[in-house]
Structures are given as C-alpha cells and as structure tokens.
Amino acid sequence: MYKKIFLSLVLLILSITGVSAQINTDRVMNIGRNALYFEDYILSIQYFNQVIKVKPYLADPYFYRAVAKLSLEDYKGAEEDCDKCIERNPFIIGAYQVRGIARQNLGN
C-alpha cells in the first residue's frame, strides 16, 4: 500500500517538475560565461560546446567560445568560431574584433 502511494507521489512530482533529458541552454551559457570570467577557459569551452550541440543555430556560444580559444592562444579555432558567429548574427561587433585579433596573431 505504502509502496503504491510512494510511487504515485514520485510520478506526480516528476510530472510537475518537467524532468527531461534536454539541458537548459540559458543556464549552461551562464555557467560558461562565469567560467570564462574566472579564466577557466577549458571549462567554459566545454559548456559552450554543450550549448552548440543542442542549439547550433545560436551565435552567442560561438562568440564566447572564440574568446576562450583566443585566451588559450588557439587563434585558428577562435577565427573559425568568429566566422560561425558572424554567419549566424552579423551584428555581434565583438566577433569582428576577436576575429581581427586572431588573424593578427596568425599573421593574416
């Protein structure tokens, strides 16, 4: 009897909270930006990769990942991410700046 009540409560709670396998991309983006702020560039790239995997059409994760790659001196990767960011949203001015810095360091 108690087992049935317990299972019913668990199912009710799960249905109310909306448990799903999808990630909350806004939250993951915030965590990635915080990692970037605290100069944990590798961790921030991992978080931005998660967002890109789920929503590849967004421009922001490409931009922030480019900033992290630039900080790690991965200039080619930063340039490629800026290109993808600009392709998705040409109004992110910082992407042009980061791409320019990356190209300057590449000698282009």
Please annotate each region the language model reported:
Residues 2-8, 12, 18-108:
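Alpha-helical tetratricopeptide repeat
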